[in-house]
Amino acid sequence: MAISKDHLLWMYETMYKIRCYEDKMAEAYAEGKSPVFNIGAGPVPGEMHLATGQEPAAAGMCVHLKKEDTVTAPHRPHHHAIAKGVDLNRMTAEIFGKATGLGKGKGGHMHLFDPDVKFSCGGIVGAGIPHALGAALAAKKKGTDWVAVAFIGEGAANQGAFHESLNMAALWKLPFIVVIENNQYGISVPKTASTAVPSNDVRAAAYGIKGYYVKDNDPIDMYNVSKEAVERARTGQGPSIIEIETYRYLGHFQGDPEVYRDKNEVTLLRQKDPIIRLRNYLLNECGVTEETIAQLENKATSEVDQAYAFARESDYPKPEEALEDVFV
């Protein structure tokens, strides 16, 4: 399958930006926190779930999407939001609970919403699947070529909404794609303790749809598989399931003691960092120069730093605004 060099450059910049962003959020979250109880003062209220190491899933899919395409994400949403083009300044302000945030500081990091690029996420496991299904149904009824993508973790593939939504999508041949990021653990439970099948893409056969498996967190394979799935969806060939074998380098949440996995496991997998692998591919196979790579990295770092500064300098909402936008 032909691969666009411009697409790969976009993927690299996006993946690098995601990594920089998650590193910055990890620092911000740790600020002022007790090392024992993980509570205390700091710019980030609430919990924080970071996607360091899972960058290929979001970048490899979203490179093929348009602004009009819908993306829903789970409680670990930063990489999807960045790849879909959510405003980084307002996203960071929302995470910091500021009035300039996407939800005026009331949603936090698990409830980002940007209708301008058709992106949403939520803290309920699997809830984004039927939301994306509805967007896919609307896209078909309107006669568009838009697609809807639901990103989930492997644990959510055992939710009833997963099966119900895929059954409906298959029956109506909707432009619907479910991307399963199998990062090996549902909180602390290994996939082998929760699911009998070796990978969730094989479940596609039960719905009569296409299933894909991306091994080893491979950015190039994710690009190719996503391209085919999106093209099938746009041309009326129905839904697909993609499972990517990925890995989160950090805990389930910031402050996770990670007693359920061996530190050597993380060390070994960090040696196969997908960002470094894509960087080497661009240099060795695509004729991209070190100078071009450096420019992309500097641009990404600058955008992250700018978003961080914007959020830190923004004001908190006023107490009298607490009940605004609340519907009962």
Language model segments and positions:
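Conserved acidic/glycine
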Residues: 1-57, 254-328
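Cofactor-binding active-site loop characterized by glycine-rich and histidine/acidic residues
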Residues: 33-172, 190-196, 201, 206-208
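A general secondary-structure junction signal
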Residues: 75, 244-246, 326
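Glycine/Thr-rich phosphate-binding loops of Rossmann-like dinucleotide-binding domains
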Residues: 81, 250-252, 317
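Glycine-rich ThDP/TPP pyrophosphate-binding loop and its adjacent helix/strand module
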Residues: 117-122, 126-313
